[in-house]
C-alpha cells in the first residue's frame, strides 16, 4: 500500500508525493488526524486527493496512508431508519461518542452496529448449490421490511455450512461456500465500492407506475418504477416539499433520501416528521422504510460527490433483494458545484460556466444506475431503482449547464415555475414545460387496474390546458368577450382542472395523498362536466349561465380535501348532482 507525504494543501484538495504505488479512486488517510480522502488524479509519483473532511491545519510533510481499496460502503441489516453522513457514518452514534452536535475530524465509526444481534432465519441448507444473489436467509429488520441476506456477487459453489436459526451479529459468518476448493465465509454484511454498479441478470422496460399520491405527478407526468426524473426550480418554488411528498407517500418499498449540499433544516424536518407519519400503503411508520444520508451545506464540499454515489449504491443493494427503491437527491446542482470547485483547484480546463468538461459523463453515470431489473440469484425476483433529483439553477435559468445536461438523461421533467409558486399554486409544476416519456408505458396499468377511460381523460386534460394557453394570448390582445362560447368553456374547464385536480396541499391530512382511484374519480367528474357543458353550449346556452347555475362546482373543487380515499362513494353523489343540475338547466332553457 502506498505511503507518501503531503506536498500541497488547497482547500479540500491535497497533493501528496511519493505515491507511486497508489491507484485511481483509492481511499487514503491524510495527515496526523487521518482524514478520509480519495485519489482523483495521479501524475508520476504525485497523487491528487479530494479530502472528505475539513483540511484546516494539515501542513506539507505530514504522512498520507494508502488503503489499497476504493471508497466502499457496508451493506447489511441496520441501515433502515438511520441517519448517516455522506461517508455513511452513523450520525446518532457519533453524537453519543463525541457528546457534541458537530462531527469531529478523523472520527472513524463503522456504518453497521457491530454489537447488535439480528434474528437470522436460513432459507438454504448444507450441500445446496449457490449462485451470486441467492437468498441465504432473512432478517426481519423492521416491521415493514424483511432484509434478505444474499450470496455476494462473484461468490458461487456449494454450501459447505450454514448456521441454524438464531441471533447473530453482522460480522458473524452465517455460511461457508466451497468455491473451487476454497472456503469462502459469507457474513450478514458485505462491502461494495460505491462507484461500481452492482450486477444483475437483465434490464427490463419500466412498465409499472411509481404511484406518489401527488395528482400531477401520477397522472399528467407519471414516472415508472425504475425511471428517472428531475425537478428543476429556482429558490422558493417548492423543490424540497415536492421531494418530501415523494419520499413520504410514494409506493416504493424503500426510500433513500440524500440531502446533498442543501440546508440542514430540511433534513431536520424529515427527521421530525417521519417517525410520526404512517405509510399510506401499509400503515407502518415511514421511518421503517427510509435511509437518510445527510451531507448538508455546512459539511465539506468534496463529500457531496461521495453522498450521491453512496445513495445509489444503497438503492442497488435493496433492489437486488427484490424491492422497488426510490432514491431522492436534493440537489444534484450542489454536487456539480463541488465538481466545479475541485476541477478549478486541480487546474483542469473548464467548460461552460466553469463546470468541468466531464460533467455530462458524471451525470449520465449516475442516472444510468436507475432501472427495473431481473436480479441475480434464486428465487427469481424483480427490483427497481427510481432516481428523482432536484436541480437548483441560479435564477431559475433552465439553460444553465447542470439543468440542460440533466435533461438529456432523464425521462421525466417536472419543472417548477416561480410565478405559479407566487400565485400559491402548489405543486408549482409548469404543465406546459413538463414532460414524461413513460405515459405510453404506464397507461396499460392504469386502464387495467383503475379506469378503462384513464388515457382518454388524461389526454383531454392535457389538451385543454394547452388550448387554454393559446386562448390566453388572444384574451390578452382582444379581451375575453371576443371569444366564441366554446372557447370560453375551454377556459372555464381549464380553471376547474387547475383548481380541482392540479392544486394539492402537501400539509392537508386528506389532500396530501390521493389514491389512484380518487384521482380517476376527480378526473371523471371534470370530464363529464366538460361533456355536459359542451352539449349545453351547442344548444345555445351561454357559458356565463352555465357557471351561475351549476352550483356543484365548488363542491367538486373542495372534494380533494373533504373526501377521504376510502369514501369514494361520495363521488357518486357529486356525479348525480352534476347530472341533475345540467338536466335542470337544459329544461329551463327549453333546449
UniProtKB/Swiss-Prot annotation:
InterPro entries: ATP-synt_VA_C, ATP-synth_a_Xtn, ATP_synth_asu-like_sf, ATP_synth_asu_arc, ATPase_F1/V1/A1_a/bsu_N, ATPase_F1/V1/A1_a/bsu_N_sf, ATPase_F1/V1/A1_a/bsu_nucl-bd, ATPase_F1/V1_b/a_C. The keyword Transport applies. CDD domains: ATP-synt_V_A-type_alpha_C, ATP-synt_V_A-type_alpha_N, V_A-ATPase_A. This is A-type ATP synthase subunit A. Has multiple subunits with at least A(3), B(3), C, D, E, F, H, I and proteolipid K(x). GO terms for molecular function: ATP binding; proton-transporting ATP synthase activity, rotational mechanism; proton-transporting ATPase activity, rotational mechanism. Keywords: ATP synthesis, ATP-binding, Cell membrane, Hydrogen ion transport, Ion transport, Membrane, Nucleotide-binding, Translocase, Transport. NCBIfam families: ATP_syn_A_arch, PRK04192.1. It catalyses: ATP + H2O + 4 H(+)(in) = ADP + phosphate + 5 H(+)(out). Belongs to the ATPase alpha/beta chains family. It is a peripheral membrane protein. Its EC number is 7.1.2.2. ATP binds at residues 233-240. GO terms for cellular component: plasma membrane; proton-transporting two-sector ATPase complex, catalytic domain. HAMAP family: ATP_synth_A_arch. PANTHER family: H(+)-TRANSPORTING TWO-SECTOR ATPASE (PTHR43607:SF1), V-TYPE PROTON ATPASE CATALYTIC SUBUNIT A (PTHR43607). It comes from the Archaea. It comes from Metallosphaera sedula (strain ATCC 51363 / DSM 5348 / JCM 9185 / NBRC 15509 / TH2). Its main location: membrane. Pfam families: ATP-synt_ab, ATP-synt_ab_N, ATP-synt_ab_Xtn, ATP-synt_VA_C. Component of the A-type ATP synthase that produces ATP from ADP in the presence of a proton gradient across the membrane. The A chain is the catalytic subunit. GO terms for biological process: proton motive force-driven plasma membrane ATP synthesis.
Amino acid at each position: 500500500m502506498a505511503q507518501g507525504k503531503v506536498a500541497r494543501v488547497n482547500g479540500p484538495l491535497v497533493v501528496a508525493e511519493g505515491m507511486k504505488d497508489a491507484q485511481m479512486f483509492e481511499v487514503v488517510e491524510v495527515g496526523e488526524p487521518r482524514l478520509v480522502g480519495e485519489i482523483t488524479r495521479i501524475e508520476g509519483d504525485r497523487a491528487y486527493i479530494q479530502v472528505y473532511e475539513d483540511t484546516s491545519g494539515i501542513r506539507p510533510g505530514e504522512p498520507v496512508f494508502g488503503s489499497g481499496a476504493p471508497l466502499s460502503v457496508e451493506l447489511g441489516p441496520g441501515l433502515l431508519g438511520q441517519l448517516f453522513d455522506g461517508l455513511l457514518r452513523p450520525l446518532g452514534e457519533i453524537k453519543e461518542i463525541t457528546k457534541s452536535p458537530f462531527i469531529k475530524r478523523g472520527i472513524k465509526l463503522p456504518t453497521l452496529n457491530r454489537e447488535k444481534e439480528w434474528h437470522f432465519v436460513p432459507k438454504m441448507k448444507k450441500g445446496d448449490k449457490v449462485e451470486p444473489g441467492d437468498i441465504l436467509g432473512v432478517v426481519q429488520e423492521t416491521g415493514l421490511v424483511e432484509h434478505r441476506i444474499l450470496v455476494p456477487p462473484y461468490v458461487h459453489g456449494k454450501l459447505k455450512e450454514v448456521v441454524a436459526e438464531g441471533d447473530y451479529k453482522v460480522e458473524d459468518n452465517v455460511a461457508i461456500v466451497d468455491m473451487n476448493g476454497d472456503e469462502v465465509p459469507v457474513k450478514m454484511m458485505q462491502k461494495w465500492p460505491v462507484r461500481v454498479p452492482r450486477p444483475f441478470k437483465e434490464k427490463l422496460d419500466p412498465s409499472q407506475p411509481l404511484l406518489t399520491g401527488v395528482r400531477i405527478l401520477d397522472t399528467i407526468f407519471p414516472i415508472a418504477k425504475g425511471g428517472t426524473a428531475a425537478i428543476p426550480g429556482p429558490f422558493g418554488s417548492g423543490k424540497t416539499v415536492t421531494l418530501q411528498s415523494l419520499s413520504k407517500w410514494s409506493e416504493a418499498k424503500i426510500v433513500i433520501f440524500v440531502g446533498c449540499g442543501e440546508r440542514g433544516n430540511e433534513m431536520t424536518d424529515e427527521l421530525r416528521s417521519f417517525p410520526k407519519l404512517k405509510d399510506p400503503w401499509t400503515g407502518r411508520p415511514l421511518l421503517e422504510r427510509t435511509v437518510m444520508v445527510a451531507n448538508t451545506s455546512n459539511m465539506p464540499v468534496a463529500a457531496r460527490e461521495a453522498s450521491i454515489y453512496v445513495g445509489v449504491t444503497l438503492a442497488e443493494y435493496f433492489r437486488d433483494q427484490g424491492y422497488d427503491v426510490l432514491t431522492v437527491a436534493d440537489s444534484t446542482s450542489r454536487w456539480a458545484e463541488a465538481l466545479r470547485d475541485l476541477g478549478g483547484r486541480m487546474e483542469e480546463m473548464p467548460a461552460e460556466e466553469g463546470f468541468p468538461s466531464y460533467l455530462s459523463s458524471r451525470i449520465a453515470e449516475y442516472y444510468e444506475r436507475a432501472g427495473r431489473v431481473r436480479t441475480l440469484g434464486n428465487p427469481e425476483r424483480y427490483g427497481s431503482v427510481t432516481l428523482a433529483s432536484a436541480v437548483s439553477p441560479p435564477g431559475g435559468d433552465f439553460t444553465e449547464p447542470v439543468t440542460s445536461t440533466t435533461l438529456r438523461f432523464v425521462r421525466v421533467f417536472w419543472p417548477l415555475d416561480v410565478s405559479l409558486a407566487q400565485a400559491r399554486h402548489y405543486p408549482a409544476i409548469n404543465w406546459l414545460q413538463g414532460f414524461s416519456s413513460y405515459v405510453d408505458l404506464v397507461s396499460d396499468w392504469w386502464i387495467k387496474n383503475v379506469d378503462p377511460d384513464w388515457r382518454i381523460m388524461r389526454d383531454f386534460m392535457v389538451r385543454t390546458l394547452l388550448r387554454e394557453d393559446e386562448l390566453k394570448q388572444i384574451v390578452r390582445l382582444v379581451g375575453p368577450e371576443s371569444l366564441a362560447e366554446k372557447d370560453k368553456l375551454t377556459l372555464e374547464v381549464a380553471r376547474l382542472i387547475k383548481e380541482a385536480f392540479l392544486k394539492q396541499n402537501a400539509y392537508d391530512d386528506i389532500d396530501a395523498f390521493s389514491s389512484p382511484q380518487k384521482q380517476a374519480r376527480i378526473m371523471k367528474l371534470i370530464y363529464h362536466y366538460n361533456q355536459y357543458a359542451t352539449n349545453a353550449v351547442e344548444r345555445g346556452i351561454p357559458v356565463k349561465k352555465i357557471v351561475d347555475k351549476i352550483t356543484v362546482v365548488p363542491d367538486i373543487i373542495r372534494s380533494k380535501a373533504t373526501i377521504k380515499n376510502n369514501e369514494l362513494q361520495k363521488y357518486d353523489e357529486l356525479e348525480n348532482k352534476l347530472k341533475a343540475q345540467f338536466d335542470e338547466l337544459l329544461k329551463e332553457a327549453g333546449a
